[in-house]
């Protein structure tokens, strides 16, 4: 087990030998030569958000709320493409926006979660896709409600440091308070919801804060056992964002954080988004990643629209060059496909 002090020394070191030693340890501990991915459809239910993050282009004051028939059409088409994950995403607390609320009311819904529940249920009844929801902070009761129609759910921790709430990254984003995010991730554990979380590298955090964030995820998982994967995501500059002059993390920074994440989190899958790391993603296989995350043959990444998904054939070539077999997975990892972790309806659908 690596300590926080050892982790910090590693991040500060410029020694190639220290990297090679840890890579040797990871290789010795890793028996599988598979790297997984989920073939998905990205459904941006609504692109308004109460948070105004310094690195985000998803939020739009002139929001679009997808209509039910629009989502039905995307899901039906995704089914023909062989997609098995429906990624439902919208901004946090969109009900705070009176215009969004009014649109939902006109369609006969009391709020966005009722709307989401209905489209998720439709997805389960009419396609072979399984819903995965990522929509910001949710309460215990809201998580419990959505558990009935989700195979898994997600929320990026991003960073466990409250200091970042006073920086350009999160000063206008009340939902990025790490206490709120940790509480939700823990509530998901209490409810036995298979969960995806992660850290965001390069938004002004210190090396110590990166390490603390990974150890916080480890602490939560040790208590509840529900974190199926952790995303190590790199900040990318986008034109027009408040942080457009910030420096992106270097490949070495990412390489080291992936190594540490693998060693600290042990049995949790480590994911790096391939569309944000086209030039370096292949190298990160050597650092310990074992999942490429969601990749869509149909829809773009609406959070990072400037970064197209690689073709699945391209991912296969990337993986095989380092001896890895590309393996498709569901949005819920295999070890969580039990009655303990899934609603009866979801479990029956998977087993069928």
UniProtKB/Swiss-Prot annotation:
Keywords: 4Fe-4S, Iron, Iron-sulfur, Lyase, Metal-binding, S-adenosyl-L-methionine. [4Fe-4S] cluster binds at residues 49, 53, 56. Pfam families: Radical_SAM (PF04055). InterPro entries: Aldolase_TIM, CofG_family, Elp3/MiaA/NifB-like_rSAM, F420, rSAM. It catalyses: 5-amino-5-(4-hydroxybenzyl)-6-(D-ribitylimino)-5,6-dihydrouracil + S-adenosyl-L-methionine = 7,8-didemethyl-8-hydroxy-5-deazariboflavin + 5'-deoxyadenosine + L-methionine + NH4(+) + H(+). The keyword Iron applies. Its cofactor is [4Fe-4S] cluster. Coiled coil: none annotated. It comes from the Archaea. GO terms for molecular function: 4 iron, 4 sulfur cluster binding; 7,8-didemethyl-8-hydroxy-5-deazariboflavin synthase activity; iron ion binding; transferase activity, transferring alkyl or aryl (other than methyl) groups. The keyword Calcium does not apply. Binds 1 [4Fe-4S] cluster. The cluster is coordinated with 3 cysteines and an exchangeable S-adenosyl-L-methionine. Pathway: Cofactor biosynthesis; coenzyme F0 biosynthesis. Residues 35-275 form the Radical SAM core domain. SMART domains: Elp3 (SM00729). Its EC number is 4.3.1.32. It is an enzyme of class 4 (lyase). PANTHER family: 7,8-DIDEMETHYL-8-HYDROXY-5-DEAZARIBOFLAVIN SYNTHASE (PTHR43076:SF15), FO SYNTHASE (COFH) (PTHR43076). Belongs to the radical SAM superfamily. CofG family. Consists of two subunits, CofG and CofH. Catalyzes the radical-mediated synthesis of 7,8-didemethyl-8-hydroxy-5-deazariboflavin from 5-amino-5-(4-hydroxybenzyl)-6-(D-ribitylimino)-5,6-dihydrouracil. This is 7,8-didemethyl-8-hydroxy-5-deazariboflavin synthase. It comes from Methanococcus maripaludis (strain C7 / ATCC BAA-1331). The gene is cofG.
